[in-house]
Amino acid sequence: MIEALDEAIASWRTGRAEAADYDALVHRARRRFASLVAVPPDRVAVGNQVSTFTGLVAAALPDGARVLAAEEDFTSVLFPFLAHADRGVRVQTVPLDRLVESIRPGVSLVALSAVQSADGRLVPGGLDALASAAAAHGCLTYVDATQAVGWLPFDAGRFDFVSCAAYKWLVSPRGTAFGVVRPERLELLRPLFPGWYAGEDPWTSIYGAPLRLAKDARRLDISPAWLAWAGTVPALDLLEEVGIAAIHRHDLGLANKLRERLGLPRGDSAIVTVSADGGLERFRGGDIRASVRAGAVRLSFHLHNTESDVDAVARALGV
């Protein structure tokens, strides 16, 4: 990825960059992501962040709609819905372990992160149970898959709307993201940011009326930050080459080795959280990158990590 970015920046700096080359990269990234989440490419829109896609879904809800969400979920999942309070959109939050059982008649949409950003928790009972409960009650589903896609097998076709920022587990530059829409739900979403790149043929949609948007999810595309996409493509290529099943085994295996060292029960997440006592200083000597989220230290294991990293964390924690 770094080499691809360096090459793209060099081409840009020297004036050798061609717009059509970047366009090909975006199309390739769309296809790669579609493959990773098991949907056709025509269901995938490209963008730059999760909250943009959440905002499209929030704007599509009717006045007075009721949204069900998990307590303390990432705000890019919550804020866009809360911003519609002036037209009666209500957001009810419940503990994650009660989310599925709280889906009932009257809920317009359930919104959640597939994996919780703060502590790595997955919804109890699994996403299949959530999708089934929502379908049984005629409830739409919106899933932010940012903390899932790249290590956790994920079928985006189970949900009405999905978003995913690529800079986390897709190991891509910040500023690239994807949205997935079921074909039968596409008409619910008004393109709020339509520009030339959302056109049926972007290169003939640069000037003038009438409106001529793509017929598929590309109608929701946001004009891409080309250099960021130059780094996203090789990252997605690598993930597809290694395979999500193998990455899942690797990442979860390392996370559970750390849990075992810490005397914690085995888990189902590649994210491990430990007490924030002592802050991050105890990790700096071991060249360990960690974050403090929601009062705990968050540690994540991915394809570049090895058992030596587990040992380094254990030493830093004194176990």
Model regions and ranges:
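Pyridoxal 5′-phosphate
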Residues: 1-319
